[in-house]
């Protein structure tokens, strides 16, 4: 079942802290977080994760999985997901070390999606994206069958 939640607040109001807590990166000072056994969460932070600079884009994605199910029985390859997020054939052959900040963020998101999460936590997901990438991301997330928290 698809569910969407938008977190809004002033800078410093705790949006990122809440997301990191939900992703299991922070501990509660009090209380507890109970996660169901079928929950598979993925967190896209504002900060770029280090990726091996010697990898090619497609290689970095295929290290997670070769295929991913998008829901409704639809399955696509790592290469097809790369294309949906703006990495054409030439882009998939580029070295990670040669990517811009926005391209690395796009690659990070692609890798998260390849892991088949049913809960996506996206902290300021549009940072560093151009209009074309934003449109592709919006189209992809519109069809996302899981829980989406932005």
Question: Language-model features: where?
Answer:
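ABC ATP-binding cassette signature C-motif
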Residues: 1-150
